[in-house]
């Protein structure tokens, strides 16, 4: 059975790169009727925090990505990691390196001065017992390094990139697999070693991650071989790029799923767009789809090698499509807590709230637009400059005065739309202006601006809560 994993480090909130990796893993698992599992890689003791773990788990659930087993906590498996390192030491495939940080810095500086690529020169690979004892007598601690044969040919078939080949000489010398510690101990195990041990223990069949891990894959394949562990299949998805074609980073601003949520993006749109970042839809399939619809056709034959540029216009279009497809009930459910954050208390009449949502829904791009556009229905707005200019047009206030008089003589409850339209025409005739002037002026009076949703429905909603007459009186001064 196919088993894939997401292995986030809880050193920050859920990043869109991790979210996209999660989506690809989940889609492949579901397509193959396999298992999607989580491993929390919390071995960075200084930066890992429980609140980040919680944020990652909540973010995945928000996106609609659920896991099939209890998450594995990497820090609880340190004994197994050290056991694997001891096995490598016992087999002569790893050794203790006593080179100090000062010596390693001097080595790298010399390489840089000679225009050489930085790499460890394997200086302590063949220490004699006497040399080791001398370093220990000095009080030196040691890292543990895994031997890498410069002549080694490392090959694998990548599901995205096809045949891949690396030489051992490309990997920077013997690899550190445990941090510095006294010579009679094994220090904290490091990433490449623990990932191999954990993936094998979890029986992961497919490792799906970003292309920035390709060099790690070459190193890890050597460790799989040295430890005699079964090899998974690898797939390296393209990086997510900014508009300039550089790897998306915090410098580009919004990179956290938290940020997207706060901006008013929906989980359906984000999950949809994460799928499109590097995957091409099959011919005949629309670009708006659910994760389950994508899972039915997902495969790595349609995952691109080239980097995926983040396109805000496409994301906004997708989000708008999602919002436009919501019922008024669903939109009201999502907007009610956002309105409450602004201190707004909607009328007790639910039908009014549903009608407001039905009015606003077709114009929304972000969920927070449903807050911005709802504001004049809850708070009486100031008259903006364009509204004041409109009301200053010859005949505009006369038309508003005529309309106000009609409403005071015959209050409108917002239900008879034909009557409202007739009043607009009558006011235009009375003030000797075009009907368009009356409509623009009424919008200015009611909303304080010239842009907004359907005028008659807007007027009806305000009339139903007794807000049309006060706003008309205000505009007349």
Swiss-Prot record:
State the span of motif ('KMSKS' region).
247-251
Q: Which residues form the signal peptide?
A: none
- Catalytic activity, EC: 6.1.1.17
In chain numbering, motif 'HIGH' region lies across: 8-18
Q: Which class of enzymes does this protein belong to?
A: ligase
* Membrane-crossing segments per the record: none
What is the annotated localization of this protein?
A: Cytoplasm
The residues listed in the UniProt record as binding ATP, with positions renumbered to this chain, are 250
Some GO term, biological process aspect, for this entry: which one? glutamyl-tRNA aminoacylation
Task: Write one Gene Ontology MF term.
Answer: ATP binding
Q: Which reaction does it catalyse?
A: tRNA(Glu) + L-glutamate + ATP = L-glutamyl-tRNA(Glu) + AMP + diphosphate
User: One Pfam family, short name please?
Assistant: tRNA-synt_1c
Disulfide partners: none
What are the UniProt keywords, alphabetically?
Answer: Aminoacyl-tRNA synthetase, ATP-binding, Cytoplasm, Ligase, Nucleotide-binding, Protein biosynthesis
Record's GO cellular component terms: cytosol
Q: What is its main location?
A: cytoplasm
* Assembly mode: Monomer.
Say which family it is in. Belongs to the class-I aminoacyl-tRNA synthetase family. Glutamate--tRNA ligase type 1 subfamily.
Q: What does this protein do?
A: Catalyzes the attachment of glutamate to tRNA(Glu) in a two-step reaction: glutamate is first activated by ATP to form Glu-AMP and then transferred to the acceptor end of tRNA(Glu).
Record's protein name = Glutamate--tRNA ligase
| Taxonomic source organism | Synechococcus sp. (strain CC9605)
